[in-house]
Amino acid sequence: MRALVTGAAGFIGSTLVDRLLADGHSVVGLDNFATGRATNLEHLADNSAHVFVEADIVTADLHAILEQHRPEVVFHLAAQIDVRRSVADPQFDAAVNVIGTVRLAEAARQTGVRKIVHTSSGGSIYGTPPEYPTPETAPTDPASPYAAGKVAGEIYLNTFRHLYGLDCSHIAPANVYGPRQDPHGEAGVVAIFAQALLSGKPTRVFGDGTNTRDYVFVDDVVDAFVRVSADVGGGLRFNIGTGKETSDRQLHSAVAAAVGGPDDPEFHPPRLGDLKRSCLDIGLAERVLGWRPQIELADGVRRTVEYFRHKHTD
């Protein structure tokens, strides 16, 4: 298979590129380095099965890029991922996450792409749902422009599927963590805790520590992307998580144990817009894709901490 991965220099995207290459596929990676890092791909410099294109999905001539490389499947991970930035600047968020997605879909349908695998957001699109773990049948109720843009991307791609025959599926991950996650900013709390504790800096928990999330390891998420790239799950959204809730306080304890550091976070007022709970029902992915998470939280946290420990000592 010849695949194109947008957002290829990002945390999840670069891990997906590695997996596809390991499986024997050829990969074209595309990224504008807005949040992705060249260091995530530098180990592929001499890999003849990998080509990298520096481009922005909002401004690049995507038709020319896809015409040149002729991918069979496009994995669409490029996105504006900062929820708070989406609240402050919804127009920019929509330009990337909605218009960028439509531009990619238009180029894909014109150049013979078989399928787009789109990245949605299981951690945000359901808002405060009526049940936990939350299934795909729950109504979407975006609480941010970021979440609204992810839902809009799903709708547009499903419309392209019905109108033009461009197949698509949607991966809706819970809270993804693992090596290469960005430890800066406000997202990626496992990486943030790990980096701070390894550096001897204070850690912060927003609220009283009882907010919960469903933490899923990046390798498990990448496995779901690979599975759905086949001729399965057309037009469907697949929740990709663990079905287990972990509180902020429990997560801090797990990271502190892996680091061997103090389990004594500072507690700060809750942040506007933060959900109280999030946990995904993964039954559809189990039934249709044969997918289940393989990495338990303690093991995944340990692997993540070791990655940052190695970086910290370099």
Swiss-Prot record:
Catalytic activity line of the entry: UDP-alpha-D-glucose = UDP-alpha-D-galactose
Question: Which cofactors is this protein said to need?
Answer: NAD(+)
What keyword terms does UniProt attach to this protein?
Carbohydrate metabolism, Galactose metabolism, Isomerase, NAD
- Protein's UniProt keywords contain NAD: yes
**What does the UniProt record say this protein does?**
Involved in the metabolism of galactose. Catalyzes the conversion of UDP-galactose (UDP-Gal) to UDP-glucose (UDP-Glc) through a mechanism involving the transient reduction of NAD.
Please give the subunit comment from the record: Homodimer.
Record protein name field: UDP-glucose 4-epimerase
Please tell me the species this chain comes from. Mycobacterium tuberculosis (strain ATCC 25618 / H37Rv)
Lineage, highest ranks first: Bacteria, Bacillati, Actinomycetota, Actinomycetes, Mycobacteriales
